[in-house]
């Protein structure tokens, strides 16, 4: 039995892709090991609007993870202690200097210095809290690499505890920078989402022996009722193309909508179902929509599962994805997937012969949809390939087993370099 501490900026009841993944994996690990969670944000608080010129110019949002962080109470979920490491009122003085680089002129001319300076302030407050929680711990796993991840790494180094991080971001994209990449060799292990990400980090100088693929897990209800879903939404005996996600342009919603008219030229009874919250930019896209367009908005996890199980094709031709769990969910029900050219997605979909990765244009999307609807055998084969992939590599037991093996290996591995990031 090992003692494992996860360090994450946010955790349940805060809800997000990373938080859901962390909760699933932690619960499964807790069946055999002592697992605890340390997090700064355990709620739903979003940055509040600060009126006037100051509110518009200052980087107010960045302060809600440190200086303006809410105070939460620790609790226990099943066998897992969830420790809140949010700052006390008395910690505010130590974090006060973090306010300075939010001023536009200072940020513009001294950003590298303030990145370093801010972290020193942050570590002075959060480091001791994390060190206290790490007493007797065998492995520290940092989820995402921000100031809390840096503090978790430094605390683990100070106590001689091996550490691993899973950045949950693709190399070179939003959420990662050169300072973060320079930090990776200090961890005993770094988890990447795909082999493509692993190769990219190797090319950027991260030692290959430090890099391990740690997949994500599809989020599925216990049972689904696709027939009931089709009956409820008047979709009986018609082809159904499903989109699940936020209605943002980069997700491919607008392009998919436009593709429908081209699909109807060949397959006029095809219906398009959109599940997910709206965005301000998307409101006009669905005005006066054809009756074969169904927008269901935000739904429960149960109804989302029913929708995926009921569709013929899952289509989300996104330009950017970090955790493409919805593709895995579609494959869990043997559905062929049409994705976009987001980093890592073509390798995931076409590399496993489980669908198509297309350009985000109505022409490319409609061609892929039409091809699948006109060739049921191909569609079934691609969906089955995806199902095999999920069962072999992305099941909860498979992902947890891989993490568990990595932790055990790290316990006997020499500590990584002690060089601090500057």
Where are these regions (language model features)?
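Conserved donor-binding/catalytic core segment of Leloir-type glycosyltransferases
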Residues: 5, 191, 235-251, 257-260
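Donor nucleotide-sugar binding/catalytic pocket of nucleotide-sugar-dependent glycosyltransferases
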Residues: 21, 39, 172, 180-224, ...
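Glycosyltransferase donor-sugar binding loop
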Residues: 44, 244, 248, 271-284
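Nucleotide-activated donor-binding/catalytic signature segment of Leloir-type glycosyltransferases, i.e.
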Residues: 283-303
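Aromatic "clamp/platform" in nucleotide-sugar-dependent glycosyltransferases that forms part
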Residues: 319
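Short hydrophobic beta-strand element within catalytic cores of glycosyltransferases
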Residues: 336-339
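Conserved acidic donor-binding segment of nucleotide-sugar-dependent glycosyltransferases
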Residues: 351-363, 371-377
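A short, well-ordered alpha-helix in the C-terminal region of glycosyltransferases
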Residues: 364, 371, 378-392, 399-405
